[in-house]
């Protein structure tokens, strides 16, 4: 399980160093093999250990290619999916097209989200957090049943 937000730097080749606290579990779970793709709703990337990505692929394979909305999701997620292998120094090369899509420059936020990471441009991440907090504080909508049962 991945949690927490960590600022990491992209080097001139587009590689990021995976924080040490995640390296061992990633090597055990996926031998350092990862898959990166776009997020359909946010200006960030999604980074999955290969076994977790294979579960997503199975779910995507059950969608109908004849349904335009389902085909669109398949096209976007699978079409942007890029495999990356953690090297001996614990670095991952993020494809240039993906970096461009998410507006990633030097400073990047690696955000743990249970079974995957999100990759955000640092400034975009902080703005998103601010926007999310503002939205929660100003919302007039009742909490969903699931959120009502969540005790923090």
From Swiss-Prot:
Domain of life: Bacteria
Cross-referenced InterPro entries: MraZ, MraZ_C, MraZ_dom, MraZ_N, MraZ_sf, SpoVT-AbrB_dom, SpoVT-AbrB_sf
A GO CC term attached to the entry: nucleoid
Gene Ontology terms describing biological process: negative regulation of DNA-templated transcription initiation
Gene3D superfamilies, alphabetized: Transcriptional regulator MraZ domain (3.40.1550.20)
Domain SpoVT-AbrB: 5-52, 81-124
Cell compartments where the protein resides: Cytoplasm, Nucleoid
Disulfide bonds: none
Entry keyword Transcription: yes
GO molecular function: DNA-binding transcription factor activity; transcription cis-regulatory region binding
UniProtKB keywords: Cytoplasm, DNA-binding, Repeat, Repressor, Transcription, Transcription regulation
Keyword Membrane: no
Family statement: Belongs to the MraZ family.
Subunit relationships: Forms oligomers.
Function: Negatively regulates its own expression and that of the subsequent genes in the proximal part of the division and cell wall (dcw) gene cluster. Acts by binding directly to DNA. May also regulate the expression of genes outside the dcw cluster.
Protein name as annotated: Transcriptional regulator MraZ
Taxonomic placement: Bacteria, Pseudomonadati, Pseudomonadota, Gammaproteobacteria, Enterobacterales
């Amino acid at each position: 399980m991945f949690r927490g937000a960590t600022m990491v730097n992209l080097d001139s080749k587009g590689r990021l160093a995976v924080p040490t606290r995640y390296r061992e579990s990633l090597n055990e779970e996926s031998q350092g093999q990862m898959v990166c793709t776009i997020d359909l709703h946010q200006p960030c990337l999604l980074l999955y250990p290969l076994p977790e990505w294979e579960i997503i692929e199975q779910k995507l394979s059950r969608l109908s290619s004849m349904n335009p909305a389902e085909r669109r999701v398949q096209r976007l997620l699978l079409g942007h999916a890029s495999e990356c292998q953690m090297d001996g120094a614990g670095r991952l090369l993020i494809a240039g097209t993906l970096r461009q899509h998410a507006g990633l420059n030097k400073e990047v936020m690696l955000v743990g989200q249970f079974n995957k990471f999100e990759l955000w441009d640092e400034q975009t991440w902080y703005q998103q957090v601010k926007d999310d907090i503002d939205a929660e504080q100003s919302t007039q909508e009742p909490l969903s049943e699931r959120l009502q049962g969540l005790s923090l």
